[in-house]
Amino acid sequence: MVGRYRFEFILIILILCALITARFYLS
């Protein structure tokens, strides 16, 4: 349970970082 929760948390952070970098590249 804890391992899966931590994995999902890291996955969400990586997606957010990708969106932020994409915005910087687009703008």
From Swiss-Prot:
Protein name (Swiss-Prot/TrEMBL): Uncharacterized protein YdgU
Induction profile: Expressed during stationary phase (at protein level).
